[in-house]
Amino acid sequence: MDAAAIISLLNSTSDRVDQFHVEVYRLSLYGAGIRGMEEETSLFNLFNSLNTSTGDLQLSVSFTVHVLKKFGFTGLAELTRYASPDFNMASSYPKADLLLTVTSFLYDLHPVRERSNALTFISSVYLNGYNYRSVTMPQFVKVMFDKGVIMIGDVSALDSLIKQYRPSFFNEYMERSKLTNTNSTFVSDDATQDNTAPAPTIPDDRATGTVAAEKGQPSAQVNQPPTTGGGNCTVSGSTQTSTNSFNSTNTVTAAGKEEKVSDDVTKGIKFLLMTATDPELKGVLERLKPLDGRDEVIEQFKNGVDLYIGKYGKHPVVVGQSAHTKGQQGSLPAEKVTNKIMEIFKPKYIIAIGVCFGMDGKEVNLGDVIVSDRIADLYNIRVEPGCIKARITDADKAGDTLVSLFRNPRNDIVSVIGKSRRFNMVKPSFDKENAKEVKVHCGPMVSTPALVDDAEFKEKLSKARPDALAGEMEGAGIFLAAKDHKVEAIVIKAVGDLADGKKIEYKDWKPFACQAAAEYVLHHLDDDRTIHM
């Protein structure tokens, strides 16, 4: 095993992981018999504890990949190469499999009302009215196990919920739980460190080893987005935070080797869907279906990039991601990754999907979808007293075919986005910034190297491009790659903030915006009229 490479990959993964996945991973370690990790918030340190307990680096990697993928964490293809293709959580760690399975079942309930009803039922019937809102979902599942509500091979207490929401869940789990523990690597609750030769501790040479949730709650002045059903919901106190996740059980990963995709599949792909951040990728992957004749979406690591191949609406597509970390956001990484994917596939169209910031809060509202007919490159600028000027004055035009397809939304498209089960509205009142329907605008976007969260700087951008509706970071690079390969490109992103110094207060709008942009593109690509593009 290449320990140095694994350390590097785990460092990168730990930097990207959110609090929800840390909570789930900590729960899985509890199921593996590892104690005393309640306060640990670093995935890297948690992995270190697992590796010390097992004494087997490959097993620890296999365990980690299984947990993260089960709950939609993406960008793991390279780390998966070091995992064992034969790893089986049910036989190796049956308690962890139970805890993860029940957590997944409860998280998959949507809309939020159904999930809340299920938790209320469990709490009132089995836990004497335990306040499930006082803990996170993984912590609640741990309470269920500790109180004997669920046991290895026995989730009959949830039978009525299973029959109502997911009939196949019980049978699937029971089949797995029949596996014997022969040759199992299960660490029992009573096991001590003396019984297992400890693995060498992987040094954590990063500046910090903790990953915590963003601090600060949205202020009363910032309206909150409609809750997106179908995602995961971490319940803490009276606050519900939506975190949408891709169900990776529909994905096949080429572990340790690259799966050969037939030339027919490669030639049939006309669309490249480009994302930058993890939330943007999740919004797309949640809607990606297996290709015709396949049971699973294909996940590959080729040419140094993670690829996802499946069907988006009526079309086979390849999905790419340019920013696994914050430091990879921007035009240059986006151009580099897009070019690498274009070397493998020969799509006719590139669609960048994700989140942007609104330039004019009076015209463009939080959650609105922006279809770019042009991208103004503000990477090359001249800074003058009190203003900035674009040195490239001509904005790049989006592809004519793509603009024609996406620029004039039919009324039912807006309604579909607003009323889809993925955008189930739970708030009783709505205003201009928290509307029941998502509005769609078509116009120029600026592409800038800066993550803008300053009203004065945004004003300078607005003076440089007064016609711009929104701004983002990757479009200029994607347009350059499209120009190099002589294909059409367009940027379709939804407004996640207003770049006015309140980014933390707007943070709940980001996952909603990811979903809105992904859903808008899906609705068009699912139209029969696009089949012959």
Curated annotation (Swiss-Prot):
Residues 184-248 are annotated as: Disordered. One of its GO terms (molecular function) is methylthioadenosine nucleosidase activity. Its EC number is 3.5.99.-. GO terms for biological process: L-methionine salvage from S-adenosylmethionine; nucleoside metabolic process. Transmembrane segments: none annotated. Residues 1-262 are annotated as: Death domain. Residues 263-533 are annotated as: Purine nucleoside phosphorylase domain. It catalyses: ATP + H2O = D-ribose 5-triphosphate + adenine; dATP + H2O = 2-deoxyribose 5-triphosphate + adenine. Keywords: Hydrolase. Residues 218-227 have a biased composition (Polar residues). Residues 236-248 have a biased composition (Low complexity). Pfam families: PNP_UDP_1 (PF01048). InterPro entries: Nucleoside_phosphorylase_d, Nucleoside_phosphorylase_sf. One of its GO terms (cellular component) is cytosol. Has 2 domains, an N-terminal death domain and a C-terminal purine nucleoside phosphorylase (PNP) domain; the PNP domain has ATP nucleosidase activity. Expression of the C-terminal domain alone leads to cell death in E.coli. The C-terminal purine nucleoside phosphorylase (PNP) domain cleaves the N-glycosidic bond of ATP, and to a lesser extent dATP, to release adenine and a sugar triphosphate; has weak activity on ADP and AMP and no activity on dADP, dAMP, adenosine, deoxyadenosine or other (d)NTPs. This is Death domain-containing ATP nucleosidase. It comes from Amphimedon queenslandica (Sponge).
